[in-house]
Amino acid sequence: MTGEQSCSLDTAGTPEQRLGVLGCTVVPGERRCSALTGGWSDGAGRTWTGPLAVLADHVLGEVANRPQAAGFQPVTTALSLDVLVPPPWPGDRLHARAARTAGEVLRDHVTASVRDPDGRLVAVASAWTADVPAPGTTPLAAGPAVGARPGQGEIGELLTDLTEVGSGPDEAVLELDATGWTNQNGTVHGGVWACVAELAATRLTGSAPHAVNRLQLAFLRPGRGRVRLTATALHRGRTSGLVEVRGRDATGRVCVHAMVGSRADHAAPGAVATLSPAGRNAPPPAR
C-alpha cells in the first residue's frame, strides 16, 4: 500500500485529531505520520511537549497494528520520548516515521523519529507493544484515511478537562475527566497520559526556566473515566530536573508510571539569573 493513507483513526473526534495528528502513510517497512502544531500552545506563549507524545504514540502503535489473531488486540506497554530540540519549532507541523526494530510472538519494539519541515531531527521515540487477549472482540483493521484539518486550541480543550486538586513545593495532584480522551479500545490514550504527566510535572518547576526533554511512561493497566495524577519532585537542579508521576483510576489502582525529565532552558529570558549558585541540588526560586 505504498503511498496510501491508512490508519486506525476515526474520521472525527479522536484525541489524535483533537491534538493535530493527521492520517498515516504506509510505505514498505514503516509508517509515516504528520501533526499540526498550531494547537499545542496554551495561549500564554507556551508550546507544550506532551502533544508530541500523542503523535509518537500513534505512529508507533500503527506499526504494531498489523492483522491480529482472533481474540487479541495490540496495546502499548511502554513509551519513551526524547526531545532533542525544544519547542517552538519552525512551520506548522512535524513529521514522524516509525518502524519495527525487534520483536517476538505477540510482542514488538518499535522506534520513531520526528523532524520539522526543514528536516531537522527534533525528537526520537520508542515503544514496546504487546498483543493481549480481548475475548469477544474482533481484530482491529485499518480505518479510513484521515485528512481533515483539526481545529485549533486543542491543548486548551485538554486543560479545560483538568482539575488541580492540590499542589505544594514537592507534590502536585491533577484530575482528568478522560471520557473524551480515550483510544479505540475505550481507555485513556497513552499520549494523553503523557500530556497530563507533563502538565502535572511543570507545576513543580517553579520559576526556573526548564524545558521538558524526556518522557518515559509504563502503562500498567487501562485507565477509564476520571483519573488522578500525582507528581512528586525528585530533583530540581541548575541543569536538570526529574519528576515522578503516578496515574490512578477511580479505585486508586496505579495505571501509569511516568518519569518527566527536564533540562535548563538557557535560551529563556532570565535563565542565567535563575540558576542557583548554591549548587545542583538547590531548589528553584519560590513562586
Question: Positions of the model-derived regions?
Answer:
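Intrinsic-disorder/low-complexity, polar/charged segments enriched in Ser/Thr/Lys/Arg/Asp/Glu/Gln
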Residues: E30-R32, A78, R93-H95, H109, ...
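Hydrophobic residues in beta-strands and at strand termini
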Residues: A35-T37, V83, L176-A178, F219, ...
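HotDog/MaoC-like acyl-thioester-processing domains
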Residues: E62, P87-P90, A99-Q152, R221-R226, ...
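Hydrophobic beta-strand-centered segment that forms part of the acyl-chain substrate-binding groove
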Residues: G61-H95, R100, A200-R228
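Non-catalytic linker/capping segments at the edges of enzyme domains
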Residues: M1-W40, A127-G180, A273-R287
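Structured core of small recognition/catalytic domains
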Residues: A172-T239, V243-V256
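Structured N-terminal alpha/beta-domain signature
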Residues: V26, A56, L81, D108-V110, ...
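Hot-dog-fold acyl-thioester-processing enzymes
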Residues: R18, R31-A64, Q68, E175-T202, ...
